[in-house]
């Protein structure tokens, strides 16, 4: 009986060691894959941000060149005056549209 108990003890211990190693390998592999995925996503995000910034810089350059060639440089006061005129036109058009809808209804 002593031999069977001792054999069961060593069998249980070996089972626990192998199971522990397998779990450790599984967790290590999972964390490794997670690290790879994280690195890939960070790189994709970095490339996306770089592309967005590049396009925005190109648009600013193109729009700036178009504005400068058509009208020349615009001061802040001129820009504000233009915005005020556009807002006034929009308000006037909204009022006319409202009157038109009221008369049609």
UniProtKB/Swiss-Prot annotation:
**Record InterPro entries:** PG18-like
Q: In this entry, which stretches build a coiled coil?
A: 76-105
Alphabetically ordered keywords of this record: Coiled coil, Thylakoid
- Give Gene Ontology CC terms: plasma membrane-derived thylakoid lumen
Q: List the disulfide bonds.
A: none
Organism domain of life = Bacteria
In the record, biological process GO terms are:
thylakoid membrane organization
Which Pfam families does the record cross-reference, listed alphabetically? DUF6825 (PF20711)
Does the keyword Thylakoid feature in the UniProt annotation? yes
- Where is this gene product found? Cellular thylakoid lumen
Designated name of the protein: Thylakoid protein sll1769
Q: Which organism is it from?
A: Synechocystis sp. (strain ATCC 27184 / PCC 6803 / Kazusa)
């Amino acid at each position: 009986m002593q031999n069977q108990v001792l054999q069961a003890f060593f069998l249980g211990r070996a089972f626990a060691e192998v199971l522990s190693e397998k779990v450790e390998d599984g967790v290590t592999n999972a964390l490794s894959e997670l690290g790879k995925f994280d690195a890939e996503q960070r790189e994709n995000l970095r490339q996306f941000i770089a592309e967005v910034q590049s396009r925005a810089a190109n648009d600013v350059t193109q729009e700036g060149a178009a504005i400068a060639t058509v009208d020349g440089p615009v001061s802040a006061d001129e820009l504000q005056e233009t915005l005020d005129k556009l807002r006034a036109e929009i308000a006037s058009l909204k009022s006319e549209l409202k009157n038109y809808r009221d008369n049609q209804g």
